[in-house]
Each structure stands twice: as C-alpha cells, then as structure tokens.
Design a protein with these regions (language model features):
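Conserved small/polar residues in nucleotide/adenosyl-binding loops
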Residues: 156-162
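Non-cysteine beta-strand/loop elements that form the S-adenosyl-L-methionine
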Residues: 52-59, 130-138
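A short acidic, helix-capping loop that chelates divalent metal ions and anchors anionic groups
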Residues: 140-145
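Alpha-helix N-cap and loop-to-helix initiation/capping positions
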Residues: 146-154
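Catalytic cores of alpha/beta
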Residues: 39, 119-123
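N-terminal capping/small domains of soluble enzymes
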Residues: 2-104, 111
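Short loop/turn motifs at secondary-structure junctions
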Residues: 47, 128-130
C-alpha cells in the first residue's frame, strides 16, 4: 500500500483527553490565537481538534504596557500580560463565535488570586465549553500566574477548590 491508496477520511485521529473526545490532537497554544476570531480568516477552525483560548480573567485586563513583543534572533519575546476582555464579555462574544465551529473549546483561566480563578470557573460551569485550562505558569504578571505554579501551597489552594467545582 502506498500513500495514494489511503483516503484521508479513513484515518482516525481522534483522541480522548481528560475524558473529552477530540477529533484530532491538534490545538493552538493559549495566548497565541486570541479566541479564534482573530485567525478564522486564515485557519479553518473546523480542522482543529480544539481551540485553546487566550487567558480569561474575572475582570478585563489591559495587560502590560508597550512594548510587549520584541523580535530576537531566531524568534520573539513577549510580555503581553494576559490582556483579555474579562469573563462576561468573553461569554457573551467569544463562546458563541466558537460554537459555530466543529471543534472543542478549551478556555484558559487566569487570575490574580485564587478567588478570581474560582469566580471564572464558576461562571464557565454553565457555558457550552468542553474543557478548562488553569493558567498557573504565566511569568509576566505580578500576581497569580507563575506565582501559583512555583508555590505548592498556593497551587493546592487554587486547584483543589477549582477541581471540586467542576
């Protein structure tokens, strides 16, 4: 058998991640793709296994002051600072946009405190999304982000109540 004998539709690329069936294992990295609308004219979102959104917080964040992005030899550096519209606008605008596509929705949840993360998780509980990703690794915010990821006590205070909510 050679590659011309294989019909693309005959290949099952589906995967199960945390109990959620995806049609394929391809998603975008959180923070690089907005909430999908920004790239929908260039990328067929229907072909992705999931869209992982940019971080979403309890309230809107302006992010870090400019400049936020710098080109360096072989790549780019960024310190956007989790700019986002806040959970209410995200639920009103971005989730309905993403629901138009045949792809899973993974919402990246961020915050400055455990309470903010929990507020976002509670707000998302009744929304038609497939998964949540808890962002405890963003290095360019003063509170939250990597501060949670590098402190096991903070991490436990954040993740345990969040897991119990879901």
């Amino acid at each position: 058998m050679n590659s011309s004998d294989i019909n693309k539709t005959d290949i099952n690329m589906s995967v199960k991640i945390a109990g959620v069936e995806w049609k394929n294992p391809v998603t975008v990295a959180s923070g690089t793709f907005g909430s999908g609308a920004e790239y929908s004219e260039f990328v067929d979102l229907n072909k992705l296994g999931a869209v992982t959104t940019k971080g979403v917080a309890d309230k809107p964040w302006e992010g870090n002051p400019t400049p936020r992005v710098a080109e360096v030899y072989g790549g780019m550096l960024n310190a956007v600072g989790l700019q986002n519209p806040g959970i209410e606008l995200f639920c009103k605008r971005d989730i309905p946009f993403l629901k138009k596509y045949d792809t899973k929705i993974v919402v990246n949840v961020c915050g400055h405190s455990a309470e903010e993360y929990i507020n976002v998780v509670k707000r998302l509980a009744d929304e038609p999304i497939d998964m949540m990703e808890i962002n405890i690794s963003c290095p360019n915010v003063k509170e939250g982000g990597i501060a949670f990821g590098t402190d096991p006590v903070s991490y436990t205070h954040l993740t345990l109540p969040t897991i119990l909510l879901v």
